[in-house]
């Protein structure tokens, strides 16, 4: 009975120490590859994304037990997620979405954790384009209204109300989809 107790205690001690051992060193390049792999597998996108640019991190410490940060930009490729092709074979889409991402690695956690935040690039330019499109639509609508002057005022008011409603819905939908995507996963070391 006493031998069983010591064997059990030894197994429990080994399991406890193996989970608290230091993580495998992770170079900056490996961290970028892992972050991109996590994004492509967890973001729920139809297309794969590939690294466009990485901001060098001279303070990156592969042996750190604390948190590490990396910044990079990714772009949508022509490959679909279901294809499971290597990213090197995938070219960038001509008008593909460009995302600016920040990754945080927390090596002090057991198991280590990575959290990614990605936001679309060019939000201000898109808003200006949206405003120009809306102005063009308003001008077209005013021309149509001039042609349809014979309609009753009630119809004109309803038409104007529904146009405003439609534009507000469009704005909110675009704003909703511009929100950053945040992904958090544990790293299997």
Swiss-Prot record:
The putative mature sequence has been predicted by AMPA, a predictive algorithm for identification of peptide stretches with antimicrobial properties. SUPFAM superfamilies: Cystatin/monellin. Residues 125-148 have a biased composition (Acidic residues). It is found in: Secreted; Target cell membrane. The lineage of its organism: Eukaryota, Metazoa, Chordata, Craniata, Vertebrata. It comes from Bothrops lutzi (Sertao lancehead). Potent antimicrobial peptide against Gram-negative and Gram-positive bacteria. Adopts an amphipathic alpha helical conformation, that may allow to partition into the target membrane. Low hemolytic activities have been observed on mammalian cells. It comes from the Eukaryota. This is Lutzicidin. Disulfide bonds join 79-90, 101-118.
